[in-house]
């Protein structure tokens, strides 16, 4: 197979080469327009947007205007921000517009690149979403690129976590909306819980560009977005089960599977749990919930580690993001795991939540007509992007070749030997004033290393979830001569580490608002690094205040320049990895912090055989080799065999994690199909003022089901007319039905259906007429939405419990996923049937009194027994309207009986 691939590569070129060949001619077309754009006045350039929109309205495609649109953005960027898009950024923009992932190295200007595709697609008028990993980056990028969009007459909105409903609606109505993946996802869920179409904030899902796409679509893919409310279940069970765990003995009672991050009870362990709890059979059907919580408690104690997976702050268990090391305040583990951790740490246990709405990032982002992404590290996950999202990864070459030197890993036998070697390396780097970024995989490891450095008298900064408030300051100083910065994973990602430290003088220039020509020329000289000229301009200034401020800025530039030169001489930023991550991509992200835009830099990873990756997934051959070589303590090993073993271990873990994400998606796809049906039905009700045709179809179906259930066949003597009459009375529909009348007909069952259906429809129309058609329309929509939301909430709860216990079917050699699909479909079918029946029952029995008010918005019905009472506020027109009392019939929704269709 490899031979064939090599032959094809020689004939066709590599994928990288083929991709570039497709992009280069288009970049040539864009460049050919540059001279024309430079000669265009500001007013004509800003009018391009309207011209493009008119051409699109006439049927021209976005592809056909791409060269002109991209050339326009490049010229506007140069005029407004002094930044000209490089050719490689043009390539990135084309890749994004075509719905691909553009892999661009750190420092290559992904934010500026995105403006090309964002502007072009915004011309369609359907809204473009730019997705970032946090609020800070969303706001920063929007404000940073806003001058380009303002010049071109394109509106920009930003979604922030603390925004209210109206602010969000305004932001989404803009041509371009920046925000985080969480905010976009939660707003979608909330939009499908509103009571009026005007209360929705999002428009269509037309085009999205996801920044740090690997972080959002892969790292966070295992975490669904959930809107929940507290359930009525007690938290006592968590305390009770938590007390069991210390009594269980490892190996005898349970086995820890570190690879799968799971704990399995042995037969002896099952017996032990049964004995402690005083039950006969732990795996009896009624104990499925108990088994689930025992397993969650075991995981909480044996898999999840404090200061690695979570921290305890102010009496709360807070999740630590395994990929960035950031605290995820407000996020909770689902399925009772978070409660198990709270019980373990003896803090207040929050009630387990009940799902009201949920979606995974996979299914949310797959809704977009076109999806694109940017990152510095996507190629190692190209298969997953292609299979799950139908996204191709296009590797964009750097504008300036990477000069960073990546040294081979150094492997030690023990963690102590590794840390001793790291300490020695940091000492040496600091002695020659080379800044070093030390990457760790957990808060715990970062604090161990910090204590060692403090004991050795080495000044350093720590950037982890516990010190996130100082993140910007720490990252700003990480490039200073001799700076030592310890960071968990990719904390600080999204902010470049500048060699020599942050260029604070640029902020001073921006905040200095003065129209004086000398001040303007001074600023230009500083930005061009023409320091001698800047000094001359200071002497010409007529104000001592201005001279003082300018001198301070010039001095800070000189200090930064000296620091910058010292770091360049020392070799640039050095990356010191203290452990390999499970994914090669995360290691590459750490390395990518150094060597930006052609800067010098270096990197090396220090490993030990006690590291989790080596211990759990590594080969025993490495350990055997080091013992065989009789290596003295502290001696490292560098060999191709070791490097290959590490790469194989990482590939195994990546494959394992991909399987987990794929498996989760297969389960969520079941819910997604159901979600689509419910949301489509909900939107149909929101979009249409008159839903009478939908209600009439429900009535017809309800009548049909009752007749099939009680009056099957064409022999009236065998019919159960009493049960049918009881159902009709429940609808307050008094209808004379005599079996003798139907014996004379050609098709008795059809004749019965037509009579009952006609009477039911007439009753419905009479009710609408008596209450008033306008009030009735609003009333039936409100009632429909209330019942729909209630039934959907109940169904989600049932599906959660089904999923928790579905694994038990594996004991009878049935496929849990297949069984989940089958049972989930049956449950959904019943939920829809119950919804239709309940809507019909409510509408036939609703009572409306005079001199009260009907709301513009529905309010939730409060159920007491079988009565539902809702008090209404007022119509938007101010018309007085009634209080509504709704009583359901005792014949509520039941499981649908399988039946043949009636004959007509």
From Swiss-Prot:
Query: Could you give one GO CC term from the UniProt record?
Result: plasma membrane
The catalysed reaction is: ATP + H2O + cellular proteinSide 1 = ADP + phosphate + cellular proteinSide 2
Q: Does the keyword Hydrolase apply?
A: no
Origin, by domain of life?
A: Bacteria
EC annotation from Swiss-Prot or TrEMBL: 7.4.2.8
Give me the stretches of Low complexity compositional bias. Answer: 876-889
Membrane disposition: Peripheral membrane protein
Q: Which cysteines are joined by disulfide bonds?
A: none
Q: Which SUPFAM superfamilies match?
A: Helical scaffold and wing domains of SecA, P-loop containing nucleoside triphosphate hydrolases, Pre-protein crosslinking domain of SecA
The UniProt entry's GO biological process terms, in alphabetical order, are: intracellular protein transmembrane transport; protein import; protein targeting; protein transport by the Sec complex
InterPro entries attached here? Helicase_ATP-bd, P-loop_NTPase, SecA, SecA_CS, SecA_DEAD, SecA_motor_DEAD, SecA_preprotein_X-link_dom, SecA_SF2_C
**Molecular function GO labels:** ATP binding; protein-exporting ATPase activity
Q: Where does ATP bind?
A: 89, 107-111, 496
Where is the segment annotated Disordered?
870-904
Q: Where in the cell is it found?
A: Cell inner membrane; Cytoplasm
Q: Which UniProt keywords are present, listed alphabetically?
A: ATP-binding, Cell inner membrane, Cell membrane, Cytoplasm, Membrane, Nucleotide-binding, Protein transport, Translocase, Translocation, Transport
The record, for Pfam families, names: P-loop_SecA, SecA_DEAD, SecA_PP_bind, SecA_SW
Please give the Gene3D superfamilies that the UniProt record associates with this protein: Helical scaffold and wing domains of SecA, P-loop containing nucleotide triphosphate hydrolases, SecA, preprotein cross-linking domain
Q: How does this polypeptide assemble, per the annotation?
A: Monomer and homodimer. Part of the essential Sec protein translocation apparatus which comprises SecA, SecYEG and auxiliary proteins SecDF. Other proteins may also be involved.
Similarity annotation = Belongs to the SecA family.
What this chain does, per the entry, is described as:
Part of the Sec protein translocase complex. Interacts with the SecYEG preprotein conducting channel. Has a central role in coupling the hydrolysis of ATP to the transfer of proteins into and across the cell membrane, serving as an ATP-driven molecular motor driving the stepwise translocation of polypeptide chains across the membrane.
Instruction: Give the protein's recorded name.
Output: Protein translocase subunit SecA
Q: What is the source species?
A: Leptospira borgpetersenii serovar Hardjo-bovis (strain L550)
Q: What is the lineage of its organism?
A: Bacteria, Pseudomonadati, Spirochaetota, Spirochaetia, Leptospirales
Gene name tied to this protein: secA
